[in-house]
Curated annotation (Swiss-Prot):
It catalyses: a 5'-end triphospho-ribonucleoside in mRNA + H2O = a 5'-end diphospho-ribonucleoside in mRNA + phosphate + H(+); a 5'-end diphospho-ribonucleoside in mRNA + GTP + H(+) = a 5'-end (5'-triphosphoguanosine)-ribonucleoside in mRNA + diphosphate. Its EC number is 3.6.1.74, 2.7.7.50. The active site is at residues 126, 294. The lineage of its organism: Eukaryota, Metazoa, Chordata, Craniata, Vertebrata. GTP binds at residues 299, 315, 343-345, 458-460, 528-533. One of its GO terms (biological process) is RNA processing. It comes from the Eukaryota. The keyword Nucleus applies. Gene3D superfamilies: 3.30.1490.430, DNA ligase/mRNA capping enzyme, Nucleic acid-binding proteins, Protein tyrosine phosphatase superfamily. Keywords: GTP-binding, Host-virus interaction, Hydrolase, mRNA capping, mRNA processing, Multifunctional enzyme, Nucleotide-binding, Nucleotidyltransferase, Nucleus, Protein phosphatase, Transferase. This is mRNA-capping enzyme. Changing residue 294 to A: Loss of GTase activity.
Length: 597
């Protein structure tokens, strides 16, 4: 780690918890003014801020125990000049729980301090104030205050949510002070744990921190969250699809997807579109694009890695194994594809009143280890048809693939010239699609890019533009006012509430859940729970959607722009209302788009 760099995941980690057992205050490390150039004012945590917080509580802290392995984060003199004794107790923390010697030293110095200064708090911090900090505080509660380990862990989690989140720390506590078989599973990781895109998970001394529940043999891998009980497809039972929760297979699949995409961050590596607005719509005139309908489906990447080794990866980076789904090699139908990564979405078609799950493939990143993701998008579409779809159909003709035994069907999703956009939305095509569609996707013809892609544009009718929030229902009131429930809406990477929503009887069940909301009549309105997502939209994404809501590209504007782009490509002069120095022009008469082929 660079000597002047802020610790990974520190920025939006909460500064402090609540006092534990009236004796301890858990907090993250403070950063001195030397780091201000890297930290926005609202995210700073100077030593002086700790002093101001203690004064607001009208409590005195007499001792601060620093568990980190460095002295670079802040000047201890800034602590000591406030009358707080400072002690450095180095704990490794990189995949290692505090040793017995660390624990004995911590308990001894805290006990001695409490005997001499019983009313004063002891502050404890590691880098983030959760695992090493929680471990040692819990050990003290058990050894010196006769608490059960269950009560100690639960109390710390209430004071510093979500508590100790490393499974090996919890197991070690229960091994020392209880029954290791009764150790609880680690809680869901908080959003701030997934915010850095560095490829190395370094802590304060530059060492790599191991991942919970994973093998160190995977090398330079980011910490990946495990969501137990993930649902594959909401509202439909799909036989033959089971979640992968055990190592090493889980980590191997996640790592392979990351490597194939060239993704150095954590979490889902797939390309993510942005909302179309009056600025980025101009990209349609600057580079070649294809268009397809936007299905209201569930995003999945598919890793094909040999016979009975087909896996689906969702936006939470959860992994599912798919049985009885075969992808033969075109040149030899007896062989099975491997080292192949697809991108697409699961949709539910309604056929004769029955729900039929299908996987629509709309991109390919690797084909039998070949980096086809670097090819032109048109080439990739041909690859999907020729190498993925056609060989399956050929083998079905021989009777060697029984489609009725497959958990879901597989199809390729076609893309068209952008001049067909009107027909996709308004023609018979829209009526013939047997699943929900809520807009259009405009795909540039360049190579595949993982993560947020500012040139992949999604257009939705203004009435359907939405944001995925985390809902937190809070009881609020004021002087002369009756307390009432308020729905606070949070987005990723932003500590304060982004917006509010009226709390109804229906909404109460979604407290602390991810909900999709639209903006209607000057207020946010609940649409549905997003069971396929564990995190809200990022702040920048939410702001982009809000911009498209307040300043939307209407269907008429979109059609006009595309018509004029088409005219320009045919050598005709064009001028449209989104160009600078032009006035709003009425929509041109409808043109008959080229047939969809």
């Amino acid at each position: 780690m660079a000597h002047n760099k802020i610790p990974p995941r520190w920025l939006n980690c909460p500064r402090r918890g609540q006092p534990v057992a009236g004796r301890f205050l858990p907090l993250k490390t403070m950063l001195g003014p030397r780091y201000d150039s890297q930290v926005a004012e609202e995210n700073r945590f100077h030593p002086s801020m700790l002093s101001n917080y203690l004064k607001s509580l009208k409590v005195k802290m007499g001792l601060l125990v620093d568990l980190t392995n460095t002295s670079r984060f802040y000047d201890r003199n800034d602590i000591e000049k406030e009358g707080i004794k400072y002690i450095k107790l180095q704990c490794k923390g990189h995949g290692e729980c505090p040793t017995t010697e660390n624990t004995e030293t911590f308990i001894r110095l805290c006990e001695r301090f409490n005997e001499r200064n019983p009313p004063e708090l002891i502050g404890v911090h590691c880098t983030h104030g959760f695992n090493r900090t929680g471990f040692l505080i819990c050990a003290f509660l058990v050894e010196k205050m006769d608490w059960s380990i269950e009560a100690a862990v639960a109390t710390f989690a209430q004071a510093r949510p979500p508590g100790i989140y490393k499974g090996d720390y919890l197991k070690e506590l229960f091994r020392r002070y209880g029954d290791i078989e009764e150790a609880p599973p680690p809680p869901l990781l908080p959003d701030w744990c997934f915010e850095d895109d560095e490829d190395e998970d370094e802590d304060e001394d530059g060492k790599k921190e191991s991942e919970p529940g994973s093998s160190a043999s995977f090398g330079k891998r980011r910490k990946e969250r495990l969501k137990l009980g993930a649902i594959f497809l909401e509202g439909v039972t799909v036989k033959g699809v089971t979640q992968v929760t055990t190592q090493p297979k889980l980590g191997e699949v996640q790592q392979k997807c990351h490597q194939f995409c060239g993704w150095e961050g954590s979490g889902f590596p797939g390309a993510q579109p942005v909302s179309m607005d009056k600025q980025n719509i101009k990209l349609l005139d600057l580079k070649p694009y294809k268009v397809s309908w936007k299905a209201d489906g569930t995003r999945y990447m598919m890793l094909i890695d040999g016979t009975n080794e087909v896996f689906m990866i969702d936006r939470d980076n959860s992994v599912f194994h798919v049985s009885n789904l075969e992808f033969p090699f075109r040149k030899d139908l007896r062989m099975h594809l491997s080292n192949t990564l697809l991108d697409g979405e699961m949709i539910i078609d309604r056929v004769n009143g029955q729900a039929v799950p299908r996987y629509l493939i709309y991109d390919i990143i690797k084909f039998n280890s070949q980096p086809v993701g670097d090819c032109d998008f048109n080439v990739r579409l041909q690859c999907i048809e020729r190498e993925i779809i056609s060989p399956r159909h050929e083998k079905m003709k021989t009777g060697l693939i029984d489609k009725t035994q497959e958990p879901f069907s597989v199809r390729n999703k076609p893309f068209f010239d952008i001049c067909t956009s009107r027909k996709l939305l308004e023609g018979n095509f829209a009526k013939e699609v047997s699943h929900e569609m809520d807009g259009l996707i405009f795909q540039p013809t360049g190579k595949y890019k993982p993560g947020r892609c500012d040139d992949i544009l999604k257009w939705k009718p203004p009435s359907l533009n939405s944001v995925d929030f985390r809902l937190k229902i809070t009881r609020m009131g004021g002087e002369g006012l009756l307390p009432q429930n308020v729905g606070l809406l949070y987005v990723g990477g932003y500590e304060r509430p982004f917006a509010q929503i009226k709390v109804t009887k229906e909404l109460k069940q979604y407290d602390n859940k991810i909900i999709e909301c639209k903006f209607e009549n000057n207020s946010w309105v609940f649409m549905r729970q997003r069971t396929d997502k564990s995190f809200p939209n990022a702040y920048n994404t939410a702001m982009a959607v809000c911009n498209s809501i307040s300043n939307p590209v209407t269907k008429e504007m979109l059609f006009e722009f595309i018509d004029r782009c088409t005219a320009a490509s045919q050598g005709q002069k064009r001028k449209h209302h989104l160009d600078p120095d032009t006035e709003l022009m009425p929509p041109p008469p409808p043109k008959r788009p080229r047939p969809l082929t």
